[in-house]
Regions:
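Phosphate/dinucleotide-binding and metal-coordinating scaffold of catalytic cores
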Residues: 1-25, 29-32, 37, 42-147
Length: 147
């Protein structure tokens, strides 16, 4: 389980634990519901088969409320009700788990997100209302993490 994962990362060293903690905090922020034991990654030297670094963060496809349907987007209350049903795969609560590993550095980065706004792309965008709901939810999750 998650204790064995943390123990493994701790045996690898501080930079690995930092990467694990960064992943937990990001997953809490974006509500990544698909972090499972098959996607904790490492970079491996293909000649020696030795772990050389934590992998960059990956597999965030099931995050930012990507399965919210039309009914969930009718109002912010409906969106919040939908969002509140989402749970992580490998622990019980996104925010509580992230708070366990939150560092001063994480808090500094999170504070910068209190005013976060999506920058619209010239061609590829979600509907304005959905982006507004996502921004508001990110702000709320930042506040929950910082409390």
């Amino acid at each position: 389980g998650k204790a064995a994962v943390r123990e493994f990362y701790e045996k690898l060293g501080k930079k690995y634990v930092k990467a694990l903690d960064d992943m937990i905090v990001l997953d809490a922020l974006i509500c990544n519901t698909d972090r499972h034991y098959g996607n904790f990654g490492f970079l491996v030297n293909n000649k020696t088969n030795k772990i050389v670094a934590p992998a960059p963060l990956f597999d965030h496809g099931n995050s930012l409320y990507n399965f919210a349907g039309r009914d969930d987007l009718e109002s912010y209350d409906a969106f919040s009700q939908y969002a509140d049903t989402l749970l992580p795969c490998v622990y019980d609560d996104f925010i509580l788990e992230a708070k366990k590993v939150l560092t001063k550095e994480h808090k500094e980065h999170l504070r910068k997100l209190l005013q976060f706004k999506f920058k619209k792309h010239s061609r590829y965008n979600l509907p304005d209302q959905r982006l507004k709901y996502l921004e508001k939810r990110i702000h709320e999750r930042v506040q929950m993490l910082l409390q």
